[in-house]
Design a protein with these regions (language model features):
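A short, acidic, amphipathic alpha-helical segment used as a generic capping/interface helix at domain edges
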Residues: 31-43, 156-162, 188, 231-240, ...
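Conserved, well-ordered active-site substructure
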Residues: 278, 289-336
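Cap/lid and interdomain-hinge subdomains that line or gate substrate/regulatory clefts
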Residues: 2-7, 25-33, 37, 46-49, ...
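Short, flexible loop segments at boundaries between secondary-structure elements
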Residues: 115, 176-180, 187-199, 306-327
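Gly/Ser/Thr-rich loops at beta-strand to alpha-helix junctions
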Residues: 12-15, 85-94, 112-113, 152-154, ...
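Redox- and metal-dependent alpha/beta enzyme cores, enriched for Fe-S-associated oxidoreductases
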Residues: 193-271
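Catalytic cores of soluble, metal-dependent hydrolases
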Residues: 252-282, 286-304
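N-terminal short beta-loop-beta anion/metal-coordinating cradle
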Residues: 26-49, 232-243, 303-318
Length: 346
């Protein structure tokens, strides 16, 4: 019986959701704190799993350790700690580990189910132009890290077992490691999907990841949603959604505004006039998801699971909220959600 709370520290919101989804989908009470300040209220609900958005992905390497330290100071000591990192090693990984006390870390950023593996210390596979050196991303902390080959989910489970045997007191990884741990905690091989109810949907795309851009193009081709461009977060038109699927996409306009500013600008434009009327709100990109939910005065959510791999789902005041990391999914991922919302596919 697993009795100690698992705490996941993620550098952005979609990461916090994605890493927590395997636990929620297996029936564990899973709370998401959208900020460090929301940890206290989430702890009062006594979840089995608490996933915290540090909001440190887009800040500098000097600020990232401060967010980590603030989160750790708000948490009880008797926890299992999981440092969620991007499977493509984005963000301030070494800086965040600077503020994380540990003796030995199991570092396993692979997501084998997505074709993204670790071999001889390098992340390779889907979404990568070249292998990425895991030890380099860890900096000085690589000296206290185990970086096993993980070419399959079975490898990931074996790596988790090895980490426990040798006394690793910090788990560092992404969805693949979370899947292995969720299976270990529950004994359930697969998570149950959580699906949105049919109804009008608003897709808000802030991510510029090539994987997401391909999904947007496929959605526009196959579904033909009402499309509204938002150059640097400024909507070309703002109106109550009138179609079954409305797609808002932040696009470049020649200026190099910071991603957080673009996301805040986008959120301020659409909340509440465009978000309130829809049954399903899909947010793509961690900064975008965080900004929109903050504008909606949402600080904490209970995660129910995923509707598709990498797409965490929760309900807030009866509205379905789906968040998607930029680097997840197939070209048809957004189309699948659109068809569910349109009542065409269950």
């Amino acid at each position: 019986m697993w009795s100690i709370m698992l705490v996941i520290l993620a550098d952005d919101l979609t990461g916090a959701l994605d890493c927590a989804a395997p636990f929620a989908g297996r029936g564990l009470h899973t709370e998401i704190a959208l900020s460090v300040e929301a940890i206290e209220s989430a702890l009062q609900l006594r979840p089995a799993v608490l996933s915290v958005n540090l909001g440190s992905r887009e800040v500098g390497a000097e600020a990232a350790p401060q967010a980590t330290a603030a989160a750790l100071s708000s948490l009880p000591s008797d926890i299992v700690l999981f440092k969620k990192i991007d499977s493509r090693l984005k963000g301030n990984i070494a800086a965040e580990l600077d503020a994380t006390p540990f003796h030995l870390a199991l570092v396993a950023p692979a997501i084998p189910d997505f074709g993204r593996n670790v071999r001889t210390g390098f992340v390779e596979g889907f979404g990568l132009d070249k292998p990425l050196n895991v030890a380099y991303a860890l900096g000085v902390h690589a000296e206290r890290a185990i970086i096993p080959d993980t070419l399959s989910q079975e490898d990931m489970s074996a790596a988790l077992a090895t980490g426990r045997e040798v006394g690793a007191d910090l788990l560092v990884g992404a969805r693949g490691l979370a899947e292995a741990l969720a299976f270990h905690m529950t004994g359930r091989q697969r998570a149950e999907p959580a699906l949105p109810e049919p109804g009008p949907a608003l897709f808000v795309i802030g991510s510029r990841d090539p994987i997401t851009l391909a999904q947007v193009e496929e959605l526009r081709r196959a579904i033909v949603p009402d499309y509204i461009a938002a150059p640097n977060g400024r909507l070309e038109r703002i109106a109550r959604p009138q179609h079954s699927v409305t797609l808002i996409q932040a696009t470049p306009d020649g200026k190099d505004d910071p991603p957080l500013l673009v996301s805040d600008r986008l959120a301020a434009s659409i909340v509440p006039v465009m978000t309130a009327p829809v049954a399903t709100l899909l947010l793509s990109g961690g900064a975008t998801a965080e900004a929109v939910l903050k504008a909606m005065n949402v600080s904490r959510i209970q995660l129910l699971g995923e509707c598709l791999p990498g797409l965490g789902l929760a309900y807030v005041d009866g509205q379905c909220i789906i968040a998607k990391s930029g680097g997840f999914g197939t070209p048809g991922t957004l189309c699948e959600i659109a068809r569910i919302a349109m009542g065409e596919k269950v």
